Every structure is written in structure tokens, then in C-alpha cells.
Curated annotation (Swiss-Prot):
The gene is pagP. The record marks 71 as: Role in lipopolysaccharide recognition. It comes from the Bacteria. It catalyses: a lipid A + a 1,2-diacyl-sn-glycero-3-phosphocholine = a hepta-acyl lipid A + a 2-acyl-sn-glycero-3-phosphocholine; a lipid IVA + a 1,2-diacyl-sn-glycero-3-phosphocholine = a lipid IVB + a 2-acyl-sn-glycero-3-phosphocholine; a lipid IIA + a 1,2-diacyl-sn-glycero-3-phosphocholine = a lipid IIB + a 2-acyl-sn-glycero-3-phosphocholine. Transfers a fatty acid residue from the sn-1 position of a phospholipid to the N-linked hydroxyfatty acid chain on the proximal unit of lipid A or its precursors. Pfam families: PagP. It comes from Salmonella typhi. This is Lipid A acyltransferase PagP. Belongs to the lipid A palmitoyltransferase family.
Amino acid sequence: MYVAMIIRKYFLIIALLVMPWLAIPSVSAADKGWFNTFTDNVAETWRQPEYYDLYVPAITWHARFAYDKEKTDRYNERPWGVGFGQSRWDDKGNWHGLYMMAFKDSFNKWEPIGGYGWEKTWRPLEDDNFRLGLGFTAGVTARDNWNYIPIPVLLPLASIGYGPATFQMTYIPGSYNNGNVYFAWMRFQF
């Protein structure tokens, strides 16, 4: 009964998340398709990691143009927490990672998140240790103010890194007084 109520309440959101998956055209046998590529990359990152990662949440920032001041004055923007993961670099130099992280959210309540991240990586300098990345993360989170119901997430990723240290970030889109949050963390590879 409770699950049915949630599905009815969030039908539009669920439909918008599922519709793009249904609209993907079929692919030829020679091309394994985006979904098989995705699942192969997740599996390879799970089975053959090159690194183990420590995630340290650094900042959340609520876009001031999208919030009432009295709300932002109450929100936590120091997301204390920690996370762990494993990652690898593919033959094109792109980053793949699996991670679990828990941090204090805007209401200073614990929020877990876990998933897969991918970034196309550029090394614009002669020093290959310096890199920039753009990509996405697909995962699941849960929040206190939503009764810790698992919520799927598909968010953009961007990063700047040098050697084993990377400053990685995302933006959670939203409406007025909801979402519109910049979230960033440090990732250290071991």
C-alpha cells in the first residue's frame, strides 16, 4: 500500500526517468549499445580496479538566486562525511569509479549515496599528472526528509586533478527552494 502510494505520488518523476531508456533506438549486432557498454564498464571497474579511493566531502552550496534567504541561513553547507570507492583508467584515459559515500545534508542529517561515475578526461598540459574531467554519475541516494526511500540519481560530474588528488563536483538541478545545489568533494587514489 505504502509503495503504491509513493509510485502514484511520484509517477511523473518516475516516468521522466524511465522514458529516455525506452526511447533508445535498437543497435546493430556490431555495436553493443550504450547499456551494454555501461554495464560492461561497471563490471570491469568492480572486477579489475586499479585504485582504491577515499572520498572527503568538501562543500555544498545552495544557489542563492533559487532560495529564500531564511532557508539558506538555516541550511548546512559543510557536508561532513567520508566515502570509499574503487576506480580505474581505461585505454582512452577516461576515469571509471564505483563509490559509497555518507555525508551531512542540507538539514544536517546523514545522506548516503552510492553509484558509478565516469569522466572523459583531458590532459591539456605536458605534465600528464594534471587533468580535467567531464562526465556523469548514476546511483542511488536516500534522504531523511524523504523517509530514506531510495532515490535514483543521474547527475553531471566535473573535476580537476593532479596526481592522486582530484577535486570532483556535481550540480543537483531543481526548482525554487528545492535542489539547485553545488556539491563537491576531494577524491584521493591509493
